[in-house]
Amino acid sequence: MKLEEKVKELLSPILEDRGLKLVDIEYITGKRPVLRIYIYNPEGTSIDDCEYVSQRIGSILDVEDLIKTSYTLEVSSPGLDRKFKNIEEYNIFKGKDVVVKTKEPIEDKKIFKGILEGLEDGIVKLKQDNIVVEIPLDKISQTKLDF
């Protein structure tokens, strides 16, 4: 099992305790490896949320000894300008304002702004002025939160 998958498994009960969602896990190797965990709280991700997750997963990782060298653990929110990296994010951020860019024009447009309705059967649903726009996932080049 990959490190990220094992960390995800260990994080699950920690996140559930606080009603948090896992957005992404990155493990960057090098001279000083970094394990980055991105979390989301639908009510607004706070420093307390990040600290809570960091302390708990840090203790568990020390006991499990998954990373055999010293490393830096970072827990944060996804950030304002972060692009979606996985399809789960289309449902994690349901109800949030997003900007979707397509690879080619759809109805003469390549940029769509609206409220994310979610992802279903490979179709991203976006509400614009009370009209739901459906965009095939394979036509999307980039999606990010719109603040």
UniProtKB/Swiss-Prot annotation:
Its main location: cytoplasm. GO terms for biological process: ribosomal small subunit assembly; translation. The keyword Nucleotide-binding does not apply. It is found in: Cytoplasm. Keywords: Cytoplasm, Ribosome biogenesis. It comes from the Bacteria. One of its GO terms (cellular component) is cytosol. Disulfide bonds: none annotated. Pfam families: DUF150_C (PF17384), RimP_N (PF02576). Required for maturation of 30S ribosomal subunits. Belongs to the RimP family. This is Ribosome maturation factor RimP.
